[in-house]
């Protein structure tokens, strides 16, 4: 029996969902959770109860945890490109290693692993713009994905409309930066 109940809000892989139902003997004699994605109206997901492990299904973070995560953004590390360079002697190989690092962090489904992706892409983009170049397609893809995942979960955790989450993030991060000075 799952530790979740109908009506619970959970994160399943890359989706914030409500547990809509427990379907007993739904497929091949297994019990399944029916999940309704909150930000993708027509998406329903079915997860075998015995496969609903903490690796891919977890409760939504609490409001306290969400605020603590936002407050930690100022001091959060970026992905250390210099540590990746010995294995990536060319710019193309470095881009590939960065993509692998982004993928590795996304696979954890942990909100605290999304922040370094976003901070790294932001720093890389600033450097590129300063040298007359644009954001890479890979960086844009992973930034948008990480931002979407984080904002979806924060919207529910903080009970804030999805479209206002970025404003809440920016305001709170600026406040945290001001306190550091």
Indicate where each model-derived feature is located.
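A positional/architectural concept
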Residues: 1-57
């Amino acid at each position: 029996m799952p530790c979740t109940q109908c009506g619970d809000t959970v994160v399943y892989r890359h989706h914030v969902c409500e547990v809509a139902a427990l379907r007993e003997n739904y497929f091949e004699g297994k019990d399944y959770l029916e999940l309704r994605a909150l930000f993708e109206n027509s998406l329903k997901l079915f997860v075998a109860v015995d496969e609903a492990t903490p690796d891919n299904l977890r409760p939504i973070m609490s409001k306290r945890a969400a605020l603590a995560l936002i407050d930690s953004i100022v001091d959060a590390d970026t992905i250390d490109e210099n540590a990746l360079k010995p294995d990536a002697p060319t710019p193309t190989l470095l881009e590939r290693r960065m993509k692998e690092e982004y993928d590795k962090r996304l696979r954890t489904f942990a909100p605290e692993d999304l922040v370094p992706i976003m901070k790294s892409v932001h720093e890389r983009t600033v450097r590129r713009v300063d040298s007359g170049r644009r954001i890479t397609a890979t960086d844009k893809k992973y930034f948008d994905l990480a931002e979407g995942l984080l904002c979806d979960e924060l919207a529910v955790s903080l009970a804030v409309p999805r479209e206002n989450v970025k404003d809440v993030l920016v305001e709170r991060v600026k406040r945290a930066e001001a306190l550091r000075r």
